[in-house]
Each structure stands twice: as structure tokens, then as C-alpha cells.
């Protein structure tokens, strides 16, 4: 098989297939990119794992335009391509190569959240459930028929990194479960294979297609005139990079809890005593209402207060509770989100 993937999300599937004895004749990943604090050229997590495992590696800048690499991949005569968060659309010349097809592990319940950021958009939109699907690939963006899906509930306090870790494990599991089915169906006429595999066309699945567009820097700004729940979803969905300002410095807000009585059962137990101490909407949004040494900063919003439990001030390390308060030298009545320009 050929394995296509780039971020850490794809590594568990590569490991699972390799450890289960499948012959991986090649791994295709994105080229090295500048990343991290030092902004240095770094290999993708999948490339690094492939090198560690001694697997043959390809890193096309744009596979659609690189006929030489396409020809080399074809010469490997892979039976199947497994794709997990590769990051480029595959052209028909690649999709049509393996006799058992190209199969993609997608981190949403298709047709909801087609595109590159389904995990972030599930959280930003307040979805209560999401999941993973294995689908046959077409030239369209995540439009192919679905072989299997698994649903999972999203926790109120679950951030994008935590949800990604859960879904990546499920992706690996579903591929291991699906490979024997795909192999048993064998090559042949597509319509007959789909019937044998009992794939479901996306237009037959309940719900209209939605698209997870690319996120911009402006999407990461916290607007304290929004509701506490909208702010919380932004913090969770864009973890760890949603930000506000503090004395003209960037303050990343990385863990929050909305102090809403209706959410009491879903909040951390130690946070629940804070409920009801401030009247909703009576304070200027963005103002600090309290500095709770063991918990963090209580900040006013358009609706109920929002507790900031973890943050990272520009030039500092991540901090929780009392340490965060000390780093900010925060006092009641000060405001966030004032006088800062991205």
C-alpha cells in the first residue's frame, strides 16, 4: 500500500498499518515547512515516522503538477492508497492508480465539515457530536461514498488537541477494521464493488454538506462582546492559539469555563461554587470581575462570566490559575482586548 499523510493526526494510522504487517511500499507527505518557536525547517510528523521506520518517502510540493513523482508512485504497483490528512487534493491520475482504490480517513461525520479543518469547525460551531469516516476518494473535496463512520460525543471542556487525539486513534482502528473488507471486495467495476462493500453515497446521508474553510489570524481574536459560550468555543476550537490582548501584549487564552448555571453538571467540580456570583450582562465585556487564585481570572462577557483557567502571555510560558494572575499582575476592573492591533 501507499500511505499519504502529514500531521501527527496521521501517525497512529501509519503505525497501526505498519505494525499489523501490511506492506507499505511508500509514504507520501508534505515537504518540510518552517514551524515552531525557532521557525526552522522541520519534517512533518509523518515524514519523521517514515524515516524512523525506514520506509520509502516522497515529498511532492504539489503532486498534481509533478508527473515524475506520479510515475514513480505508479511503478510501485501499490494495491491501495490510504490517505489521512495529507493536505493536497489528489488528481485523477493518482486516484485511478491502485486497483483497490484510494481511501481517506476524515475527521467528521460527512457530509458535515468537508475540508481541511473539520475538528476545529466542529468545536467552533458547538457540535455536540462528531466522528470519523472512511470514504472512497473522488476528485471532489471529500465527496466520495462512505464505507463506515463512528460517532463520538464532544465534551464541553474538550479542546481541539484532545479531540484530535481521540479521533486519530479511531481513524487507525477503523482502517484496520476496513482493510479486510476492501481487500475481499477486490478490484473490478466500481459500481459492483460499491454494492459489495455497501458504501453509502453522501447525498443519501442526512444533512446538507458544510465546509470547513481555512482559518485566518482574525478568526483567532477573542471578542469579549460575544457570549461566554461563543468565546469558550473559540478557545477550545482554536487551541492553543485563540488570543486577546493585555497591556498591548498578546495573551493566548487556552482553557476556559463558561459560568452558566445551566452547564453546572458539565463544569469542573471546583468551578461550580463560582456560579451565580455575578449577574449576567451587568458588567462591561472584557473586564476582570475576580482573580480566583486557585482557578484563574473571571472575565465579563455579553452574557455570563467566563473563567480563564490557562493562558500564555507574550514572552512567557503557559500558566494556570495563580501563576497566570501573577504573570499578568491582574486586578479587578482591568480589561482585556483593549489597545491591541494584529
Curated annotation (Swiss-Prot):
Belongs to the Fmt family. This is Methionyl-tRNA formyltransferase. Its EC number is 2.1.2.9. Attaches a formyl group to the free amino group of methionyl-tRNA(fMet). The formyl group appears to play a dual role in the initiator identity of N-formylmethionyl-tRNA by promoting its recognition by IF2 and preventing the misappropriation of this tRNA by the elongation apparatus. It comes from Prochlorococcus marinus (strain MIT 9313). The keyword Transport does not apply. (6S)-5,6,7,8-tetrahydrofolate binds at residues 108-111. Keywords: Protein biosynthesis, Transferase. GO terms for cellular component: cytosol. InterPro entries: Fmt, Formyl_trans_C, Formyl_transf_N, Formyl_transf_N_sf, Formyl_transferase-like_C_sf, Met-tRNA-FMT_C, Met-tRNA-FMT_N. The keyword Isomerase does not apply.
